[in-house]
Regions:
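Bacterial N-terminal signal peptides
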Residues: 9-16
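Short amphipathic, basic-aromatic surface patches that mediate peripheral association
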Residues: 56-71
Length: 146
C-alpha cells in the first residue's frame, strides 16, 4: 500500500518538475528572412469535405523533433494551430486536438474539420517543440468548411 501511495505521489511530482524544466529551455535563433506559410489552403478559401493543408517554409530547413547536434542549426518542424490563439513565445508548444505536431518532419496533412469557419496558423518549433527566437509564425488564416 505504501509503495502504491509513493508512486501516486512521485509520478505527479516528476511530471510537474519535467514541465517546469521544459519551460526553461533555451530558444534557438532563426534567420531574419525565414518565413513559414500556407501553400494550401488559401486565406478565405471555402472547402468541401476534408482539407488538404500544405506547409511552406523558406530560409530554414525541416528536421524531425528531438534531432540536435551538428548540421541541425536553422532547422525545426511544423506545428499547426487549429481554432487556437497564437502561442506563448517562451513555452513548449502544446499538443492536443487544437495544436497538431508534425515531429517526423511532415510538410502536409489532411484535416477532417466540422462544417463552419475555422482558423489555421503554422508555428515552426525547434527540436524541443519551442518556438524560435523570434518566433516563426505564419499569418493566421480563416477557411470555411461546407
Amino acid at each position: 500500500m505504501s509503495r502504491r501511495l509513493s508512486l501516486l505521489t512521485l509520478v505527479p511530482a516528476l511530471v510537474a518538475f519535467s514541465l517546469a524544466q521544459a519551460q526553461g529551455l533555451p530558444r534557438s535563433a532563426r534567420p531574419a528572412d525565414a518565413r513559414v506559410y500556407f501553400i494550401t489552403p488559401a486565406k478565405g478559401q471555402v472547402v468541401h469535405g476534408k482539407v488538404l493543408v500544405r506547409f511552406g517554409l523558406s530560409g530554414m530547413g525541416v528536421s524531425p523533433a528531438g534531432v540536435t547536434g551538428p548540421g541541425t542549426e536553422g532547422t525545426g518542424h511544423h506545428h499547426l494551430f487549429v481554432d487556437a490563439p497564437p502561442p506563448a513565445a517562451d513555452q513548449v508548444l502544446p499538443k492536443d486536438e487544437h495544436h497538431l505536431h508534425f515531429g517526423k518532419g511532415q510538410t502536409e496533412t489532411t484535416l477532417d474539420l466540422p462544417k463552419g469557419k475555422h482558423t489555421l496558423q503554422l508555428v515552426f518549433g525547434d527540436a524541443n517543440h519551442v518556438p524560435h527566437d523570434p518566433p516563426l509564425l505564419s499569418d493566421r488564416i480563416e477557411i470555411t468548411v461546407k
